[in-house]
Amino acid sequence: MRAGACLLGAVIAGCLSQTSVAQEAPVSGYEFLLPETKALQDDDFANPGMLWVELGEELWQKQAANGTSCQSCHGTPEAMRGVGTRYPQWSETQGGIVSLEQQINMCRTERQQEPVFPYSSDELNGLTALVMHQSRGLPMSVATSGPAAEAIARGKDYYETRRGQLNLACTSCHVQHVGDRLRGETISQGQVNGFPIYRQLWQGMGSVGRMIAWCNDAVRAEPLAEGSQMAVELELYLRSRGEGLPIESPAVRR
């Protein structure tokens, strides 16, 4: 991954010498896709991300050693409609912001007495995609007041800070150069309403955390570890930034 990301980073540095006008209203990455990629996402029979949703359905019903399952506590997956729109969110018990992946793993350890699913594992991506898929079409609506406000401020600061050998911030691409061309593709706003996504470059499913790490690698910066406090707070900021955009998971991206 690093070789490809470094090559991309060099191209980014060249492209960002151009002048561009920022877009302020939230626009889904779907609007920047090629027609054939849009068609792939729109067709549930062809959308490869649905394979992870199906895996999530199997895991939802699977009993742990203590006899519990996601379904025994929560009912059918459809009962999760609306849940994904609110994550990441403040957790009183954890004393911090918790992502949906972390909530799933807390249920694993506390309710099912099972080990956590590793980040970026098919199992965790599958369950996350299943829960998010139930909210498809509903607007993202994370809490932005109270303790969440402080976390969002830290995420925003990270988003706007230049870093890495290329000295670029997230805003360098996803605010200042939205609509510009990079390696034959159009730079989007970097909205996260489609996550977890099936990314064609990865030939697999990926979380917001994985995407953040990949972008950091592309600008030759130290990647944030998935599940770290900063990564989760950055995701919260990103979801607040896209407030109102409809959930698309599992989206397909380049």
Regions found by a protein language model. Give the residues of each.
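N-terminal export/targeting leaders of redox proteins
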Residues: 1-42, 46, 55-58, 116, ...
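Electrostatic cytochrome c docking/interface patches
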Residues: 28-63, 133-163, 254
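Hydrophobic, ordered structural segments
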Residues: 57-64, 82-139, 159
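The canonical Cys-X-X-Cys-His
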Residues: 65-77, 127, 155, 165-177, ...
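Acidic helix-start/capping segments at beta-turn-to-alpha-helix junctions
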Residues: 70-80, 87, 145-146
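Short cysteine/histidine-rich zinc-coordinating motifs and their immediately flanking basic loops
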Residues: 80-88, 182-188
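Short Fe-S-cluster ligation motifs
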Residues: 98-115, 199-218
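C-terminal capping alpha-helices of c-type cytochrome domains
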Residues: 113-141, 211, 221-253
